[in-house]
Amino acid sequence: MKILTYNQLQEAFRDYAPRDFAVSRDDAFRVMRIYYNEGGGNLVAFCNAQLGGRLAQFYFVMKMDLYSYKPCHNSHIFATCRNRCSSYNTFVAPGVKNVYMDKINVIKFKRNGSSFGEKTMALDKFLHNANRVHMQTPVIEGTYLRFRRAQRCRNNCVADDARPFALERFSDDFEVLDPSTLTTNIAPVMACYDIETHSDGHNSSKPECDVIMCIGLAVFKNDRFEKVCFVYHSEAVEIPQASDDTYVVVFNNENHMITAFFEFLKTVNPDVILDYNGDVFDLPYIRGRLKGDKPLLRRYDLPAMQPNTKLFITKIGNRTDTYYFNYYIHIDLYKYFGVDANKRDVENFQLNTLSQYYLGDAKVDLNWQTMVEMYNNKQLGTIIKYNVQDCLLPIRLFNKLKLTDFMYSQCIMYRLCTDDFICNISHLISSTFFHLALTNTRADPATGLTVSDPYFFNKDDLGLMSSKGSAGLTTGMSRLRRRRIPLKDVPATAIRLGAIDENVKYEGGKVLQPRAGVYEFAFSLDFNSLYLTIMIDICACLTNLILCEDGNVYLNQDKQAINVQLLLQLLKQRSELKKCRDSQTESEFLYDLYDQMQNLSKRTANSIYGYYGIFCKLLANHITRVGREKLTAAIGTVEGLSNDPDLLREFGLSTLTFKVLYGDTDSTFVLPVFRREEIPEEGRMATLGRICAAVEARVNGLFTNGYKMAFENLMSVLILLKKKKYCYINNNNKIVFKGWLVKKDMPVFMRVAFRAAIEQVLRHQDLSKCLDSLKANMLMYLDAFGITKPLTDYSFSMTYNDGAGKTAADDDEAAPPKRRVITVARHCREILVNKATDFVPGNGDRIPYVLLDMQGNVTQKAYPLRLFDAQTMRISWLKHMTILNTFMNELLEIFGDEHKDALAECYSAILEKYMQHQAYDKKRAALVKIATKRKAPSASDASGKRARKGAAPSDDESGSSEDEDAPCEPKCANNTFKFCLYKAQ
């Protein structure tokens, strides 16, 4: 460690960011961040360039007007409007061309110089200024540019007083570059900070009274980390010099430390500032220490600015502020992992878990109480190391996951901005529709020329047609103020979707209930992008909706509709991007860029159906209806090929039948039945592969309008349990689990043991090996508990939500206050608060816990894993055995009653060992005839019972099916018995 004063630190970094240099007309640079100054009417663009093998940073200012849109409320009696408004076709249900089109009158106004009240009326208020710049100019974050004339950067600013940059002269001053012409990536400068807070050791840290002990900062530039730690201590401290390359500055005034940290950001000049849960903890805590003031952020010689905040609401209703840093890109990486469904394969979103999963690395292990004790004893070296390590990991994660390319691809392709990094897909599509509506064109049928055909996307219309009406109020699309089109004027090809005032209930795709069992040589036949193909085929677009006088909504078949053209463009775009990606044999930079862009094309196209499911269920339901029809037709076609003469002759078989075992939305599992001796084992998989390809070709020969099925997998062994729950060995001899043994509410060790057991069935088709493996692993993990295996392998976890979601309106006569429901998560959090641990979970955090073997219900037994001591506390295996009970019943469903005795023997052996030291939760298992009507077990006798009527939904029940809310279907299993757990006498 290098112990310096703050002035010495500034001197050490004096040349870290060069201020004066030349930029030639051959030098490419990249726009990293833009900020629009509404007061001055100019755009500030922050850019990076590689000059002489070193990263150079600068900014330029461009004079421009930025526009927004607001409704015009003029009566429009005369031919011209005094407000000079423009009339646009409405995007949602506009009507029928050449008959009647609903219009919205819109005033385009300058944001620079407009009043606050005018901006609050804007119809595009869901956009950031950067979005507007992206839509109205060629300056887009992430794009590569080049100056048309050589420039000189002075004090980090490229400017020419004699010829200031202006939007109307953009093409004279700048050249937009195609990334494919470049050989190297220009990366942003990355920074990440983290704070460590003090406490009295009995309560959680509170900004009103507990100081910030230190602020760590890591900066990544030119493939190198710089590490700095700002430390506060009220007394003189000595930190020994060490070989570590961390710069350490000690302050005896906390406010001076905080101010110095934010000043130093200007010195190292990052483009991206990361934190981990900073929106919820670090930034509010810093504000608390500053008596509620927001810190000032400076960059270059630009005016200092405070961060802006905006309310961020998660899908489950949790509400937090998001901080925007104006001149810098600020990303709370914790939120990214929380909202991105693609990251749900990790156990939780703690930084340590993510680092181990993606980086194979972990945090420095330092107990919070130990840290506070060290601080009080002036032993700061380990604290500094811990603090700085927490700053390195988020940057490494960001780079490992190639999130820079993802962030800028969203900007270039969909006019999002860097502040939209954690936006949901709904915002992405709304922003895209807004831009496409204003710039829409179509081919003139008379001349064949492309002509302008603008629409206006009014996001308020989405809320109107998707909101649920109260009693006595209009519902559905009748809330839209649209003139009804006479039935005679509705095109004959239009599709009737349903009643205008219908309160639509969403109906999903077709799912066949499979018969549980083990099957050999099944294959899957899936539709290629089924819902996307349907949307193109039926011309699914909000501009094609027609509200008719007969009380129904119709879907016009205009193939030039905005969404149809978007989907066709995305399909073509993805195909071209994949070709570009695969052709990159030398440039890793271009390979990663094209890969991120093609993935984003796929994600967007696949999400538009879900967008309709939120805002226009009538249209979404019709799409799923067509999907069900296509899947039904495919099943009939496949099974109709049984003993087809051409197939029998081609493959030299006497019999070949096809049975569809399972179907789900856009896929089918097909079992070919043949005489084994007619297809020799040596070449069986190859022959079956050719049969699958022949079936694919025959099925696709009957489909038109772009519908295609593809042979996906020939599964040497398939285990079907129930709908959406199965596993198989794929073409590459890899085991794949879908919906089964994957949920996070199951402890890791049980998932490992169950999967290992099922692998014996998949690899050897041997139940005895399956049960031997299950027994051996379950007993091994029992013996290793608290000794060689981490406690996290045995724990459960639950998301903490307090006060999330909507609140019911108060009546005149207020109802008696409801009893506060204590969930497992809330119970564990209260224990953590009372014990003053280093981490108190907030809304949306998952809390790992175990059950204690003690008197009480499951909630009362729950205890946070962070505080559990295996040497002094006794764990309850009650919940674990309930999960085991579910798994044994699943095996019974698959293998049937004839194997119930072998299953019972294995189950009893495991249960006996786990119950041997239990004092309060001893259980025994019994086989029960399913058809036998029995008296419901008492509260003390049966585990896994349902919650009583009137109780809150239980957080304690395990093994509950994800299909619980689905309609009942005929039982399709092999067993008439099931296992139940009872209290041991």
Swiss-Prot record:
Keyword vocabulary terms for this entry: DNA replication, DNA-binding, DNA-directed DNA polymerase, Early protein, Nucleotidyltransferase, Transferase, Viral DNA replication
Record's compositionally biased regions (Acidic residues): 954-967
Gene Ontology biological process terms in this record: DNA-templated DNA replication; viral DNA genome replication; viral genome replication
Enzyme class, first EC level, given as a word: transferase
EC number annotated for this UniProt entry: 2.7.7.7
One function term, GO molecular function aspect: DNA-directed DNA polymerase activity
Superkingdom in the source lineage: Viruses
Known function: Replicates the viral genome, host DNA polymerases cannot substitute for the viral enzyme in this process.
PANTHER family: DNA POLYMERASE CATALYTIC SUBUNIT, DNA POLYMERASE DELTA CATALYTIC SUBUNIT
Protein known as: DNA polymerase
